[in-house]
Swiss-Prot record:
Subcellular location: Cytoplasm; Nucleus, Nucleolus
A single Gene Ontology CC term: nucleolus
Role noted for this protein: Non-catalytic component of the RNA exosome complex which has 3'->5' exoribonuclease activity and participates in a multitude of cellular RNA processing and degradation events. In the nucleus, the RNA exosome complex is involved in proper maturation of stable RNA species such as rRNA, snRNA and snoRNA, in the elimination of RNA processing by-products and non-coding 'pervasive' transcripts, such as antisense RNA species and cryptic unstable transcripts (CUTs), and of mRNAs with processing defects, thereby limiting or excluding their export to the cytoplasm.
BP GO annotations: CUT catabolic process; exonucleolytic trimming to generate mature 3'-end of 5.8S rRNA from tricistronic rRNA transcript (SSU-rRNA, 5.8S rRNA, LSU-rRNA); nonfunctional rRNA decay; nuclear mRNA surveillance; nuclear polyadenylation-dependent mRNA catabolic process; nuclear polyadenylation-dependent rRNA catabolic process; nuclear-transcribed mRNA catabolic process; nuclear-transcribed mRNA catabolic process, 3'-5' exonucleolytic nonsense-mediated decay
Protein name: Exosome complex component rrp40
SUPFAM superfamilies: Eukaryotic type KH-domain (KH-domain type I), Nucleic acid-binding proteins
Organism: Schizosaccharomyces pombe (strain 972 / ATCC 24843) (Fission yeast)
Complex formation: Component of the RNA exosome complex. Specifically part of the catalytically inactive RNA exosome core complex (Exo-9) which may associate with the catalytic subunits rrp6 and dis3 in cytoplasmic- and nuclear-specific RNA exosome complex forms. Exo-9 is formed by a hexameric base ring of RNase PH domain-containing subunits and a cap ring consisting of csl4, rrp4 and rrp40.
UniProt GO molecular function: RNA binding
High-level lineage: Eukaryota, Fungi, Dikarya, Ascomycota, Taphrinomycotina
Amino acid sequence: MAEVEEKGLLSYYFPGERIPDSIISQDGSIRLGPGLVFQKKDREEEIVVSKAGRLHQTGKNAMLIDSRTKRYIPATNDQVIGQIISRFAEGYRVDIGSAHIAQLNALAFENVTRKSRPNLNVGSLVYARVSLADRDMEPELECFDATTGKAAGYGELKNGYMITGLSLSHCRKLILPKNTLLQTLGSYIPFEIAVGMNGRVWVNSENLSTTVLICTAIRNCEFMSDEEQIKYCKDLIKKL
């Protein structure tokens, strides 16, 4: 995820401001992420900012506004960590930290039939993908990759510990392929991690003390530079 620059400066926008045409890719359609809305006024099409933050490019033709909010609004294909709060005949109702409870169909898993569908209990954690997000409907989840149909890491999260209340921007940084914090921790400690775009992170390691150390590092390193994160992690690991 790259920060978009305009005239050599990082682009910070406020609600109501228009994204300049010079920044918008003219090659094909554009995918708008959180914080951006499409408007059409007097035959003119424009992209307008709906919340304050920095403009980031998440792909060739994709962009979003990255803010330090903790309020999660579901978006299609977001990876989220949810908790089962109730069961019904066809599936589960899942808390993903948004204004609406999400639904997870019991057949929305890899290679599942009605006879082999998973049996999730109330309180269980799941790593899922948002398959439907509409402001007038409850979000829908799936536990498989949309392109391959494989689990690809989605499904029930067993054991471990879930961190909640992280800023959404912090989670976006954690999910990057080369994240300094997670790379530093991983070079010293083996662990499993699932990062949700809804401000939640699940961590599992060989013992409780190591899991607590990793969770502490994730919570405390949000505003540190790469060098500070490396030093902080090394100091924590010495205490094990």
